[in-house]
From Swiss-Prot:
This is Uncharacterized protein YCL049C. One of its GO terms (cellular component) is membrane. It comes from the Eukaryota. Present with 656 molecules/cell in log phase SD medium. It comes from Saccharomyces cerevisiae (strain ATCC 204508 / S288c). Residues 1-19 form the signal peptide. Keywords: Signal.
Amino acid sequence: MFSKYLVTASSLFVALTSAASTVDLDALLLLPGVESHDGVDTVFSTKDFYQVSFVKSIAPAIVNSSVIFHDVSRGVAMGNVKSRASIFNPEETYYDWEQYQVVNNGDWRTEWAPASDCIWREEKDNSDETPDRFPISVPYNWTSQYSIVDYDTDANEDNLDFRFIKSLLDKKNWLKKINQTVSQSSIMVAPMIRPYNVVQLWYSKDMVWANVQRQYCSGVYPGGTQCSAWSRYYHVDAPTCDEPVASYMTKMLENEVQCPNERNATTLEPLRLNKQGDSDFSLTFEEEEEEETGSKSLWSTLKKIFSKRSIS
């Protein structure tokens, strides 16, 4: 039974390495030491995995590919595998790879920051029958990105591979998945706003932090494996991508908002309701300029409704 398994695995290596850029993750599940995969680019080890299995079977299967092998038993992510012939024995193949580990990690929340421009509502005159308060649609957008910082140089000059770090942190924090970049762009209806008021949308974002290390290794089967010392610490901050992706709040005081835009008005002319009989009404105002197609103000909708009543 065991010899039959080795024949199957040997045939599998040929299929996997012949087209390394298109490694079949399901096929990797047949290899000893592999338990599951994420459907993207990472396979996970069994709990009793030993590193010798990586050099013997897994490294040849993922060489020159983007596949990451996550050794769950040691909490190490391995990948970027390359092969080379031995200078002493051309029939021996050495495999070189890099691997990462998370030393410690946690989560935190960003400070509140503006997510939109400021929107003002102009003064009402005595003939304006617009309600003292009404909601306003506020377009907003923001982007949050990961960062990797070398404590010594305050930069990521060593070009650490974020994919390895994501695999490790997603396994540790299964309730808080991370991405390189998380963004959101939409329209939110702000609370009731009075004349003279300004409104601006602010956001705060959940983040994950970690201190990570990288190591370079080389191995040959059955000769064994040698690794360099673990590197110094690198600090990682990355945005979470689970819902809700952010928290929001509105600010409506001039001394609280931070307006990147010049003051504007929500309507170019005061909004009035003019009676034209016992039951019919019409709206007289100019619509605000809309930044995004399909986004209309409350009063634009009312105008259409009352106009239809006047025509009928």
